[in-house]
Structures are given as structure tokens and as C-alpha cells.
Amino acid sequence: MAEPQQQLVDIDPDFEPLSRPRSCTWPLHRPEFSEQPGNSNTSSPAPSVKPEQGIVDFINSLSLLEETEDYPDEKPVLLNDFHCQDNCAHPQQQHPQQPNPQLTHPQQVPPLPAPASGSSPAAAQRKSSSSRRNAWGNMSYADLITKAIESSPEKRLTLSQIYEWMVKSVPYFKDKGDSNSSAGWKNSIRHNLSLHSRFVRVQNEGTGKSSWWMLNPEGGKSGKSPRRRATSMDNNSKFTKSRGRAAKKKMSLQGGLDGGSNSPGSQYPKWLGSPNSHSNDDFEPWGNFRTRASSDASTLSGRRSPFLPEEDEAAEVHIGYPGTKLGGPLPSLSEVAGHHGSENMMDNLLENLNLISPKNNTQGSQEAQTALSSPLMQGSPGYPSYTSPNMGPQPQVQQDYRKCLYGQGGVGGLNPISIPTLSDSKPGGYGPFVGQYNCAPGLLKELLTADADPRGELMQSGEGQPVLPSYASQGQMAQGGKMITHPHLHAHPRSLHQLPSPAMGLNGCAMLPHGHPVRLSSMKPQPHLPHHTHLGRGGGEAGMPSYTNGNGFHRHGAIAHHHHSHPERLPSDLDDMLIDQLDVECDVERVLHDTLMDGDALDFNFDPMSSQQSFTHSVKTSTHNWVSG
């Protein structure tokens, strides 16, 4: 240590390090110097430096500040101003209160001790002075309130009277009685009255008066009671008890649900994402909510969905019975394919899409009648015939719905696909009312290869000669009427004897009736001259004129059948199965709706071909309206 001290001295002998108490710390540091051998157990800030005597006296005076600031008899040289104010206040305070002098000043502090013996008296004085110190003295707010209540003759005071006593009796509060400066200490008095158990609040007998504050006759605690904290979920005993009861209830419910797992609620704890699966009881309030995040398909219960089951959409009105609805939902394509498998269904579709070429031209008209009288293409047999209600009994009433799949020109025939729900849901079946749009075998190939509008393609018979379809409503099956001529019809000179297909349009308009052939005979042998066509019909409704042009389209003149007022469309899943799966660019609804229903805006023009055996018709729509005569 000699070398560092020598170096410091050699550097600058005039600036020696001085030991001083650290600022901004509490309690104040009391240094012990190295020349005192009796107090060597305490460390010194700079033991190698010998301070001056004046500095030592100043430091010792500061170290005794906390023990000597409240006592009037102590008059250190450096603290005269501070103790002068204190001396002026204490005599005035002691007079009204009349306290015991020995209690206020238990012992007299001797004058400033010598530096050698200053530490031991200071430590003893610090241990003895353990009471709380305030600006008005050694008494707390509770002590002052107690003295104020004891000084009253009735041993009780109101809050305003306690304020008055504080201003009059305690010198520190004499100049703090106004409203601006009294807010702080009055608030402290109210807090002490409420927090301490030694004070009791008694209701005042008079009306509109504040309550009395009295001392607790049982004595109460001398100190402060524990502070009342705001209740929370952590320290609230009521919440703890309720949480314990909820945990017990949860355990009992889980035990009961394990025995009977058939109930829908038993699935909740077994789901890992359920709030009930957590072991922490803090999640217990979430158990009352329904689990929206879980999937209904992954659970055994079908009643866990948070959404109410929506009502099924209104079924399509049956074309045979206006206003009636389907008894059950239509099966989807996935359900239909589930019975036979998707591969089998696609095989059936491909088999029925065979592009059958027209038959040999040398075949007779009888074969053409046979081909036309067959329900659909040869790849899909088993379709029953349809008979008009005006012509006799129906051959088959209990008809499966799959047998009534329509054959639209561009879709072709379909193999009967099992749709069990449709035949089981309605006793009468749908066969007599949902007909089939018959087409000859060569039409599908023609539609797939031609560039013309698919609505303009007409059917060809197996003989290669055109089959001109006749459209008539169900009420026109057996009626007679006059015919009108079409000046632009060019037909082959030979007569076409056709046995029409027993089918019915999807919009309620039946096609050619069974057993009533339409004879298209040319009035003149020239192939390109206008001629009259006659529709051979049996007896039927009289006075119901029907108008037809040369191509065989029939319309009511005055009265439209009730089926016309109920346009129908196929079920959505059948549309998907027949159109989307086959990938044929043909809008079924548009063809049926525009072509068969909007008859007033149709005009058909036929362009002749040079071929004498077979020719193709192109149907062109125009805005020309029919004028009924």
C-alpha cells in the first residue's frame, strides 16, 4: 500500500482524496477511520488517507442527523436553523395536548460526542427511536385521532369535528385548514379511520347528520389492520370454493357419462379439442358452450352441429299433377354410383353412347316403323310405351323412375341406373308422367359432328329418311281439326308411314301418340312443290282446332293444356349425371324450354338436299310469330 500512496503523493500533493458520505443514499454512511483501532471491524471508504479534523466533525454531525432532528434540546452548530423551527413548534404542541414529557423525550441526548466515542451512542439511540416520525412530531394520524376522541366529553366525534380539533390542537395543521391545503391530510384521516380497528363508526340518531366515530370498547389493535385488497379470481375464497365444486361436479359427470356413452354429451370429453378435455379448472366456464370447431362427421352424434337443419328446398312440381311435390329427396350422383361403382356406371354410359350408323337404305318402311316404335336406341331396351289418358288405360302404372330417363337428342339413351329412392318414395311412380324425348340412333353422331345449332337437328329414321317429330299436348292426342298448309315444305314424294314413339316431352307435351300414325302424303308428285299435309287422327275433342305446319308441329288454337303452365326442369343431380359426365355441349333446359314451350316464336324452314334417299334438315328459329286463325 506504500507504493500506491507514494505515487498519489508524488503526482499532486495538494489534492488528496477526501472521504465523504455517499450522496442520494439512505441511510447515511458513517465512515470509520483507520486511526481508531477499537472500531477496525468496520470498513472505511479510504483507510489509507487521514482526513482533517474539521471534515470528521462535519461527517459525524451528518451521521447523527436522523437521531437528533426531532429533539429540541439538541443544538448542533450546523443544524441550528432546522432545530429552531422544530423548537418553536413543540412547545405549542405540548400545551394543549398535555402529554407526558418523559414519553415525548425519553432521554436527553448529550452534546456532540467526540469522534472516538461517537459510534456507540449513535447505535444505541437509533435502536431506541423506532416510532414513526411526521412533520408535526412523533405521533401518527391514528394517535392524533385517538387523542381528539378522548378529549371530547362524550368520547365521540364526527369527521368534521376531528378536522376542527386537528386544526386547533396541532400547530402543524393551523395554517392548513383551508380547502386547498387540507385535502391531503384530511384524506389521510379518513383512511386511518377506516383502516384501523380501534375506531368504530356509530350511526347518528339525528337525521341528515354524519356518523359518530368512537374508540373501540374492545380495545382493537394498536397498529393498522391488514389492508383490504380488491377481490380477484386468485384470492377470492368464494371463487375458490365454487371452482372446487365445479371440479367435483365435472368428475361426477364424467364418471356417469363413461357408464352410458350413448348420450350425445358423452362425446364431448373424449374430443381432444373440447374445452372439457383440459385438466385446468380455469377452462370450466367454457364447458357450457357448444363445440363449433369439431366436425360432425368425426363423432358418433349427429346432434352436435351448432346450426339448425335447414328445410329441404321445395321439390319440383310434378308435370303430371300441378302443385304436387316429390315425396323424397333425389339421390345424388355419388349415391347412384355407389350401388354399382363408378367404373360400372361409366361403362354403361359408354356402351350406350355407341354411334350407331343409319341402317341400310334398302330396308323397308316396316323396319323404320320398328326402329321408331322401339322406345329409344337399341342399347337401352326396357322402356315402356306411353299411352294418352284419352286413348285408353295405361299399360304400366308402377313404373320405375329409372325407366323414364329421357333420351335427348345429343345425350342418347342411358342404361337403367338404379335410383331406389325415387321409386320407393312415390307409390304411383313417375313413369306415366315423365316421358322420353325419343330420337333415332343416328342423331347422336350427327349432333356430335355437325357444326349447326343442336336445336336445329332433326331425327332420322333407321331407313335414312327424315322423321319429322310431331309435338302435341296431352289433350290433343285424339282430337280432330282442320289443317293449315305450310307453303315452304319440301318433302320426299313417297309417303312416310311411321309408328310414333310412345314418349312424352318433358314440358308436358306428348310426342306422336301410340297407335295413331301420321301420314305425310304429297298432294302432288313433284318433290319440291308445296303440298298439304294431313294428320290422321281418331275421334276426339271437337271444337278444339289445332294448327300444324308442314313439319308436324301442333299447337292449340285457343286453349292451352294445364301442363304448359307448369314448366319443368330436371333435377339438378340428373342434369349433372347426363350432361356433365357425357361432356356434350347441349343445354337441355334451353332446348326443352325454348323449342317446346315458346312455340309462338318458332318458324321452321327446311332446305332440300340433292340426295333422294336421305337428307338433313336444319331448323332455324326466327322472330316470326304465328297468328292463330
UniProtKB/Swiss-Prot annotation:
Gene3D superfamilies: Winged helix-like DNA-binding domain superfamily/Winged helix DNA-binding domain. Transcription factor that regulates metabolic homeostasis in response to oxidative stress. Binds to the consensus sequence 5'-TT[G/A]TTTTG-3' and the related Daf-16 family binding element (DBE) with consensus sequence 5'-TT[G/A]TTTAC-3'. Main regulator of redox balance and osteoblast numbers and controls bone mass. Orchestrates the endocrine function of the skeleton in regulating glucose metabolism. May act as a positive regulator of apoptosis in cardiac smooth muscle cells as a result of its transcriptional activation of pro-apoptotic genes. GO terms for molecular function: DNA-binding transcription factor activity, RNA polymerase II-specific; RNA polymerase II cis-regulatory region sequence-specific DNA binding. It comes from the Eukaryota. InterPro entries: FH_FOXO1, Fork_head_dom, FOXO-TAD, FOXO_KIX-bd, TF_fork_head_CS_2, WH-like_DNA-bd_sf, WH_DNA-bd_sf. It comes from Danio rerio (Zebrafish). This is Forkhead box protein O1-B. The gene is foxo1b. SMART domains: FH.
